[in-house]
Amino acid sequence: MEGGGKFNSMEIEVKLFATLRDYLPKGSGRFSCKMEVDRSTRVQDILSRLKIPEEIPKIILINGVHGKKEQILKEGDVLSVFPPVAGG
């Protein structure tokens, strides 16, 4: 984090499921990682930071509730990202 300091940063948890797990940083848990981010961080910023391609469809939950890429995250949020469910 650049020039932020403790007052401008916060910790969130990111959980990636199925094929998206490949985008977790090295050394992460099996499905999740903790991230220190700026207080103005949006979901899209996290997806970009993890290098998840924009064109991959995603289902986004924040604390278990449907979220949007433009949504600003808060201290302690749990961001869960799933690929769409398909099958028949």
Predicted regions and their residues:
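Ubiquitin-like/PB1-type beta-grasp interaction modules and other compact soluble beta-rich domains
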Residues: 1-87
